[in-house]
Design a protein with these regions (language model features):
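A short Gly-Trp-Pro
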Residues: 1-137
Length: 137
């Protein structure tokens, strides 16, 4: 890893620093991500939880994903920005929204997931591997 990944919410009440490279980066087209983002997909980077330093407390929203995995999405209680996610069945991982990065250009997607929910108007990199659901682990 060259340098830490840093970012947070729009108002600065939540900040993170991550001292590892992402284990997975994806554009997700599931219906939950579409609803939360207000567009056709959401972009995530997933990291080892042990390498994350978090300042500030997000407001949690717990839900069951299309995959059946229980996840908690965290939003800034002040500005409402969606910032990060955790997974009760995979506590070793911590995912952030690509747009929450201080340098969003560092986001390099590896795949498009939940293409079964995608729309023709949501144009993503055609060279990326595509999965109707999540890729096999």
């Amino acid at each position: 890893m060259s340098k830490a990944y840093t970012g947070g919410c729009a108002c600065g009440a939540i900040r993170y620093e991550i001292t590892a490279d992402p284990v997975f980066s994806n554009d997700c087209q599931c219906r939950d991500c579409q609803r939360e983002s207000g567009t056709g997909h959401q972009s995530h980077l997933t990291f080892p939880r042990q390498n994350v330093t978090l300042a500030g407390v997000g407001r949690p929203w717990e839900m069951v994903a299309d995959s059946g995995v229980r996840k908690t999405r965290y939003f800034c209680p002040t500005c409402g920005s969606p910032v990060y996610l955790t997974f009760s069945s995979m506590p070793q991982f911590f995912a952030i929204r690509a747009a929450s990065l201080d340098e969003p250009s560092r986001y390099k997607p590896q795949a498009v997931t939940y293409t079964s929910g995608g729309y023709e108007w949501d144009h993503l990199d055609p060279a990326l591997p595509k999965f109707e659901k999540m890729p096999p682990r």
